[in-house]
């Protein structure tokens, strides 16, 4: 988030913000071939549930005001307003290479 100098230097923790974590099966969709995404490389439910719960535990350890979450695998309707101008994409394969 922007600081007083309009630089992206502040975290949600710095600002006393909360977080909403929603599991999303479409998070891993390979679009390299064809017109439809492939989810073959996405984690299967037992591993995915463990990863989701580990992520929630880590979010709770970060000191945010609060961390709310949905139910893994549930059909949920979520309304949000993105405050852009950008979206951050994290590629765990790239992070692991560092």
Predicted segments with their positions:
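Short, conserved loop-to-beta-strand elements that form functional interface hotspots
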Residues: 49-79
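Glycine/charge-rich, flexible interdomain linkers and switch-proximal surface loops
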Residues: 4-19, 68-81
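Short, glycine- and charge-enriched coil/turn segments that flank and shape catalytic ligand pockets
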Residues: 4-5, 61-66, 96
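Compact, glycine-rich, soluble single-domain proteins
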Residues: 1-16, 29-41, 46-58
């Amino acid at each position: 988030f922007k600081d007083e100098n309009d630089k992206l230097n502040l975290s949600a923790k710095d600002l006393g913000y909360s977080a909403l974590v929603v599991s999303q099966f479409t998070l891993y969709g390979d679009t390299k071939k064809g017109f439809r995404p492939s989810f073959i490389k996405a984690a299967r439910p037992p591993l995915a549930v463990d990863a989701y719960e580990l992520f929630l535990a880590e979010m709770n350890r970060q000191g945010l005001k609060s961390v709310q979450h949905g139910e893994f695998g549930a059909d949920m309707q979520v309304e949000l307003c993105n405050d852009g101008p950008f979206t951050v994409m994290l590629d765990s394969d790239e992070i692991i290479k560092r």
